[in-house]
Amino acid sequence: MSLDSRRYHITTYGCQMNKADSERMAGVLENMGYQWSENPDDANLILCNTCTIRDNAEHKVYSYLGRQAKRKHAQPDLTLVVAGCVAQQEGDALLRRVPELDLVMGPQHANRLQDLLEQVASGQQVLATEPIHIVEDITKPRRDSAVTAWVNVIYGCNERCTYCVVPNVRGVEQSRTPEAIRAEMVQLGEQGFKEVTLLGQNIDAYGRDLPGTTSEGRHQHTLTDLLYFVHDVPGIERIRFATSHPRYFTERLIQACYELPKVCEHFHIPFQSGDNDVLKAMSRGYTHEKYRRIIDNIRAIMPDASISADAIVGFPGETEEQFMNTMQLVEDIEFDLLNTAAYSPRPGTPAALWDNQLSEEVKADRLQRLNRLVGVCAELRSQRYANRIEEVLVEDQNPKDPTQVMGRTRGNRLTFFPGNIEQLRGEIIAVKVTEVRSFSLTGEPLSSVATAVR
């Protein structure tokens, strides 16, 4: 196959970590001479980056792989790669189920893609799921945006939530050094990127595995310290971080977010349940009272902070009263965004083996009731934006209206307004909000904002 004819397509399922991994693997492929194909049918290398967090995500993966496997029978030179969490969890079983696959690789092996594909080229069917130490990757990722970028700061997770498969498939926590993270951000600033989201499955655990302690006896490297360390990177106007764990969310972190003007007032802190007994069964390590205190402390010094979260309903043994405690917490806090899901038993997790599973009907009913409440609360919470002036970082053209551009406020609210994307991409614009919806805004531009200021 000539270099000119090598084309690839990546389909990504799941979380922000997967999206960041896909960008890195795309960078590896382009470094090898592959060119991106928007249409998977025109590609001769298909990479499916998978998610196993819930059962329905896994079904989507197998449906997609089934279509590509049929295609390989008609196109033998097609290279089929499965990466990510399904690959890590299923391993050999995935190769048996879809024998047309050339490479199955877990998320810890994303940086090894070139070496693994060279093994495939020698005629091998390759399985790479063994735990390894993740080395720094100097390959330039192929970023999906020209304005915003993901930067991994910690891989893996050491928590053992009884419903969650992530520690099994992403391995133990491995923090990058502050110097490596800053170097990547400096490069992004030089390339014209304006916003960085620092990523970790449990980002508040950043630095626990790095050496060193302070005179106060705490870890020398924490997320709070990292924010101070990277805050002055030239060119980067905004910094976000995700995903937080209430168990490790500190007052010191809240104060840093308040003091550092580039850090956006946007916090994604999953609570999962509003009932203490359910939280204990989940092994989450905090109470709903602690969670409420975290939100109260954030809003005490940042009243307009945007709070998003995740919640699970129908956990094994959850009673109607316990579910109503979740409903009460949602009503009390009024989240800006709440990702909801019915509990889905995952292989290899303790909760999947318990005999107090709830029926699908009960789970579906509770999810529907919660979603109705979420919609009402989001609409009420959104009203605070009416007639306000918001700083919007312009990212792209509105795909539904070419006369408009779209971007996000500091609170991560999607916002549309009239403008020319070629002139405004990457600019921070002051926008007067004229229309409020539950999860987005429309407005009129007022002026450019030179720097991100509170």
From Swiss-Prot:
Domain TRAM: 383-447
Cellular compartments annotated: Cytoplasm
InterPro entries named among the record's database cross-references: Elp3/MiaA/NifB-like_rSAM, Methylthiotransferase, Methylthiotransferase_CS, Methylthiotransferase_N, Methylthiotransferase_N_sf, MiaB_methiolase, rSAM, rSAM_horseshoe
Reaction catalysis annotation: N(6)-dimethylallyladenosine(37) in tRNA + (sulfur carrier)-SH + AH2 + 2 S-adenosyl-L-methionine = 2-methylsulfanyl-N(6)-dimethylallyladenosine(37) in tRNA + (sulfur carrier)-H + 5'-deoxyadenosine + L-methionine + A + S-adenosyl-L-homocysteine + 2 H(+)
Binding locations of [4Fe-4S] cluster 2: 157, 161, 164
Cofactor note: Binds 2 [4Fe-4S] clusters. One cluster is coordinated with 3 cysteines and an exchangeable S-adenosyl-L-methionine.
One GO term describing the cellular component: cytoplasm
EC id: 2.8.4.3
Annotated Gene3D superfamilies: Methylthiotransferase, N-terminal domain, tm_1862 like domain
Residues annotated as domain MTTase N-terminal: 6-122
PROSITE patterns (alphabetical): MTTASE_N, MTTASE_RADICAL, RADICAL_SAM, TRAM
UniProt-listed Pfam families: Radical_SAM (PF04055), TRAM (PF01938), UPF0004 (PF00919)
Molecular-function GO term, any one: metal ion binding
Domain Radical SAM core: 143-384
Record: residues binding [4Fe-4S] cluster 1: 15, 51, 85
Keyword Cell wall biogenesis/degradation in annotation: no
Domain of life: Bacteria
Main EC class the enzyme belongs to: transferase
Protein function: Catalyzes the methylthiolation of N6-(dimethylallyl)adenosine (i(6)A), leading to the formation of 2-methylthio-N6-(dimethylallyl)adenosine (ms(2)i(6)A) at position 37 in tRNAs that read codons beginning with uridine.
Family statement drawn from the similarity comment of this UniProt entry: Belongs to the methylthiotransferase family. MiaB subfamily.
Subunit structure: Monomer.
Protein name: tRNA-2-methylthio-N(6)-dimethylallyladenosine synthase
Gene giving rise to this polypeptide: miaB
